[in-house]
Amino acid sequence: MAFRATPGRTPPGPGPGVPSASFSSPQPAMAAPGGIEEEDEEEPAEIHLCVLWSSGYLGIAYYDTSDSTIHFMPDAPDHESLKLLQRVLDEINPQSVVTSAKQDEAMTQFLGKLASQEHREPKRPEIILLPSVDFGPEISKQRLLSGNYSFISESMTATEKILFLSSIIPFDCVLTVRALGGLLKFLSRRRVGVELEDYSVGVPILGFKKFVLTHLVSIDQDTYSVLQIFKSESHPSVYKVASGLKEGLSLFGILNRCRCRWGQKLLRLWFTRPTRELRELNSRLDVIEFFLMPQNLDMAQMMHRLLSHIKNVPLILKRMKLSHTKVSDWQVLYKTVYSALGLRDACRSLPQSIQLFRDITQEFSDDLHHIASLIGKVVDFEESLAENRFTVLPNIDPEIDAKKRRLMGLPSFLTEVAQKELENLDSCIPSCSVIYIPLIGFLLSIPRLSFMVEASDFEIEGLDFMFLSEDKLHYRSARTKELDALLGDLHCEIRDQEMLLMHQLQCQVLARAPVLTRVLDLASRLDVLLALASAARDYGYSRPHYSPCIQGVRIKNGRHPLMELCARTFVPNSTDCGGDQGRVKVITGPNSSGKSIYLKQVGLITFMALVGSFVPAEEAEIGVIDAIFTRIHSCESISLGLSTFMIDLNQVAKAVNNATEHSLVLIDEFGKGTNSVDGLALLTAVLRHWLALGPSCPHIFVATNFLSLVQLQLLPQGPLVQYLTMETCEDGNDLVFFYQLCHGVASASHASYTAAQAGLPDPLIARGKEVSDSIRSGKPVKPMHELVRRTQMENCQALVDKFLKLDLEDPSLDLDIFISQEVLPAATTIL
């Protein structure tokens, strides 16, 4: 299949390739009432993983506190090396790993190694062993069916609840059910997130979601680092010391234009889970291509504005479940719902052939209108912000309205009561007032007089002294007691009734939690694709095409997505590693000629295509890729206790042991960390190992300065090997780099030119060239002291010749001048 990039077509939109067995949630879009929007600082998310392995199958479930959701993975085959489990651990990075105390030996050894990994980033998980009885199949099933979930109506019968949960949880996957049961037991015992709550408050569970690893492309952390897919660096702000890090110059950094926090999280998730699922990838590309059309630019900008109002719905729902809702939560939820409705209305006018637009149109249901209408008609945002508590609008509850009217009329009424009280007081008391204090009631307030020093001086006949505050004496009188009996504690009564209404409103919202969860899922997906479309528009990316018929990748005029932003000009290069021809590409060339940039460019373009992004190339066709391995940079760490060369060997060993015929392997300067002969031998052995696999050889790009690899013909000749070089031109003493890849082999590394560019002294460079030439021609390398002695002899001979040429009979000869100008300067090089 030929390469092609067609940026102007609107293709039919296939649906997502990896369906999530979770609850839906819609989204809204319009401005909320006035007031200051407040978004709380999110607590650090915790992930607690429960895992069981038995008879070659793995059952996994984990709880994520960021969205109060339990994720599970159906029983999956995994051999004794537990590579699948390691992949899951690398992806979700749990705080704790819960498992049965009764385990197979392979699992026990794996957990022992996991617990001993001192260098694991950010930290090693806590291993928690529970009694095996807690993982019994029947007790786990009963634990799942008897759980109290906010998304299940209390009106459901036991049979209906079983049917509902059976549609979500695969009860035929025994290990998964046991893992879910053990996880629920752990959450109940540890009380994750509700440690300080009353014991009657359970751990909030807002949904179950299916966690899928199928069709994912394997990429290790070293590859993410060397390709600069992610790059964390210290934050320059002194106020960010706690969080400490920000995203540096990285692929994620330039593509992350998401407007909501959950969009950023989803983009990071896509980056950590590149996929081979063509239906899912094309579904993402269809949306990006649609928004790249010039006529759709205004629609994209409008949606971007709406997405900025989509906030942390799971956190709000969690607070509602715990009855910890804040005033700002209602305002944020109101804006979120109306923004989601705006997105739905916009998507209704877009092509329904695109799956995402169809999903938003269908799944942003009328429940959103119901939620928005309830909040808008009940919550008095202006008054709530003023009083910093939940208050309701007028005409919601006649009893509350009546009490508020009475409370508002109190000031004038209390003024009249105070005048009557003053008439009954001693004439020495100049003034008084009647005040209302919530929880205490009505009191008579009298200014403290000069003679009122001792407590006994505060006594006034007919009044009961209560307390002294700010030089005011507060008393109960017969009239204030009558007011207490007549009016009661109005403020607290109003507050209690409004809290009751808030609880009823919370129940209405929680009953529709699935639609809110789906809002977040689809809105974050739309946010990510709008961000990728924006980057593709600004940087001139094109749509990649996927072909299961080819192996490897074909790229026409590809560019490095980061380097092209840092360089004034960038020379594009093409790549063709499809089919059985040239599976091993050996790239030679001078230092600084662009070999490493080219390797990273191939890796990054392939990675971008596997996350469903447009790519920096004129055309790109991606075949079947199941993994990307790299040996480009040594990720050194003191805690590893390994030498730089040992780290290099470990990286190559990963590729040798795990790469298949569908893997992409990028190797840069392997073998440079040891003796050149040994390094060359190791590189040759690795390449010959892969070449011996024939058509099953991975797609390998090797950049090296070991020209002997080619000159000595250490690799077998055949169609599997292809030699490439970076084009250069010698212009006198200068070396001109064209940064263009071409067929052939470099004649020299031109290390001396690179050394001169780096500022090394000329004598050092000259000596280096002399040694290099001697080795290359097979001549012995002369030590430095012999060179010095030979130079001294040459200088002595030159001075003797000058003496022999003197004409001592010449009357014009001045020996003083001869000594000062010829002999003394030469003496410094002789003595």
Curated annotation (Swiss-Prot):
Regions crossing the membrane: none
Taxonomic superkingdom: Eukaryota
Keyword Nucleotide-binding part of the UniProt annotation: yes
Region Disordered, annotated ranges: 1-43
Keywords: ATP-binding, DNA damage, DNA repair, DNA-binding, Meiosis, Nucleotide-binding
Coiled coil: none
Binding site for ATP: G589, P590, N591, S592, S593, G594, K595, S596
CDD domains: ABC_MSH5_euk
Gene Ontology cellular component annotations, sorted alphabetically: nucleus; synaptonemal complex
One Pfam family, short name: MutS_IV
GO molecular function terms attached to this record: ATP binding; ATP-dependent DNA damage sensor activity; double-stranded DNA binding; mismatched DNA binding
A Gene Ontology biological process term: homologous chromosome pairing at meiosis
Cysteine pairs bridged by disulfides in the record: none
Quaternary structure annotation from Swiss-Prot or TrEMBL: Heterooligomer of MSH4 and MSH5. Interacts with HJURP. Interacts with C7h12orf40/REDIC1.
Family: Belongs to the DNA mismatch repair MutS family.
Function as written in the Swiss-Prot or TrEMBL entry: Involved in DNA mismatch repair and meiotic recombination processes. Facilitates crossovers between homologs during meiosis.
Stated name of the protein: MutS protein homolog 5
Organism of provenance: Rattus norvegicus (Rat)
Underlying gene: Msh5
